[in-house]
Amino acid sequence: MGTTKVTPYLIFATSVAAIGSFQFGYNTGVINAPEMIIRDFLNYTLDEKLDEPPSRLLLTNLWSLSVAIFSVGGMIGSFSVGLFNRFGRRNSMLIVNLLAVIGGCLMGFCKISESVEMLILGRLVIGVFCGLCTGFVPMYIGEISPTALRGAFGTLNQLGIVIGILVAQIFGLEIILGSEVLWPVLLGFTIIPAILQSAALPFCPESPRFLLINKKEEDEAKQILQRLWGTQDVAQDIQEMKEESARMAQEKQVTVLELFRAPSYRQPIIISIVLQLSQQLSGINAVFYYSTGIFKDAGVKEPIYATIGAGVVNTIFTIVSVFLVERAGRRTLHLIGLGGMALCSVLMTVSLLLKDKYDTMSLVCIAAILIYVAFFEIGPGPIPWFIVAELFSQGPRPAAMAVAGCSNWTSNFLVGLLFPSAAYYLGAYVFVIFAVFLVAFFIFTFFKVPETRGRTFEDITRAFEGQAAEANKLGKGPTMEMNSIQPIETTTHV
């Protein structure tokens, strides 16, 4: 493999793709700040249409539906990433922006139309769009990035998400767009990134792996690689893709069921699912969904600004992980993140229990939340998204991304649905549940998750196939030793 460079073209292409991640983050966080204003809109609109004032239960259920329908749309969208093989990586991202525009228009005009249905339908449509983005973006970035930089560029997916959440928190302030007059603009803002990405995508390359392996366009794939990576010596990478293409020609199309049936796919798909669960069941979204209330319970006078502070920490440590992931490796960072979050979860529980007795415990709670967020962005935040693309070859990758994405969205939905009840009955002890999950995921990662830093897609696939073949001979399930994949030496210039 030749010397690769971080070229402006590579930065441009990955940044444009990451706008889809920004959309996911923005639409995840945008609904929280104007909650009371939207509840008033639901009350007023239904009061005008119904013969009698809407009940408190009906209003609560409609609000919950407005929030949760986003995750339902995400589940649907995540299982539709098969579009990637039909239309190509770049064109698929371009096409689905139509959903962002439709969803944004529905939400943006729901107030002037006095339509609760438009708000809920808009959240569903934008959820489908974001579900597609959670599959499209990490796959595209992984396929256009050099092996030596795949982890660093893969982290840009998570960076886009956290920047989106932070922008939503800031725009949601009452002095900006979170007011009774401008909240539809806050929800409809998602149209602008969609238009910007649609304008920029035609100037981005198609995935060279898709061109060579799926379309058999070797010359064009070679030219794109040379321009993206800033080197003429891409012969080894082209040869690796051709070998993978030959293997694909001998295999039948990989379905979701085949991922669980075939021994060579079973181990990596289980790892992919568990890593996605480790992200959501870590409790991060519970902390962000209800961070304002948590800070308020901890004694913070202006909790909304403390929540934004947590968003800033979120963004800073995502940037830190960009520089760490190719040095420390995926597995190591994930373990550090899980372990640190488990300790912080226990610390949050203790500090919330003792805050009324000791004033300093409020500061301890705030510090625990901020450190918890920092550990999340070191490992469980960015790594599960792009490591799925690394564990599979070109054939099963879209199906694997669909399964992993659906696992993430489903667990996200369940946490959002169940956390309020759990917090009501358990109080501060609710974070002990997340601590137990984090310890379990730490143990799984330590024994089952391989290091993929510096390895080609083909190398990783062969390692799993070798393990599966050996396991079949021994008559037991396939396993992957934690050190069975070691990084190769590469030269990279910035």
Swiss-Prot record:
One of its GO terms (biological process) is D-glucose transmembrane transport. It is a multi-pass membrane protein. Residues 33-64, 111-117, 174-182, 290-303, 352-362, 420-428 are extracellular. Gene3D superfamilies: MFS general substrate transporter like domains (1.20.1250.20). It is found in: Cell membrane; Perikaryon; Cell projection. It catalyses: D-glucose(out) = D-glucose(in); D-galactose(in) = D-galactose(out). The modification Phosphothreonine is found at T231, T491. Signal peptide: none annotated. Detected in stomach, placenta, lung and brain. The modification Phosphoserine is found at S484. Residues 276-278 are annotated as: Important for selectivity against fructose. GO terms for cellular component: cell projection; membrane; perikaryon; plasma membrane. Glycans are attached at N43. One of its GO terms (molecular function) is galactose transmembrane transporter activity. The chain crosses the membrane at residues 11-32, 65-84, 90-110, 118-141, 153-173, 183-203, 269-289, 304-324, 331-351, 363-388, 399-419, 429-449. Residues 1-10, 85-89, 142-152, 204-268, 325-330, 389-398, 450-494 are cytoplasmic. D-glucose binds at Q158, Q279, Q280, N285, N314, E377, W385. Keywords: Cell membrane, Cell projection, Glycoprotein, Membrane, Phosphoprotein, Sugar transport, Transmembrane, Transmembrane helix, Transport. The keyword Membrane applies. Pfam families: Sugar_tr (PF00083). Interacts with SMIM43; the interaction may promote SLC2A3-mediated glucose transport to meet the energy needs of mesendoderm differentiation. Transport is mediated via a series of conformation changes, switching between a conformation where the substrate-binding cavity is accessible from the outside, and a another conformation where it is accessible from the cytoplasm. Facilitative glucose transporter. Can also mediate the uptake of various other monosaccharides across the cell membrane. Mediates the uptake of glucose, 2-deoxyglucose, galactose, mannose, xylose and fucose, and probably also dehydroascorbate. Does not mediate fructose transport. Required for mesendoderm differentiation. NCBIfam families: SP (TIGR00879). This is Solute carrier family 2, facilitated glucose transporter member 3.
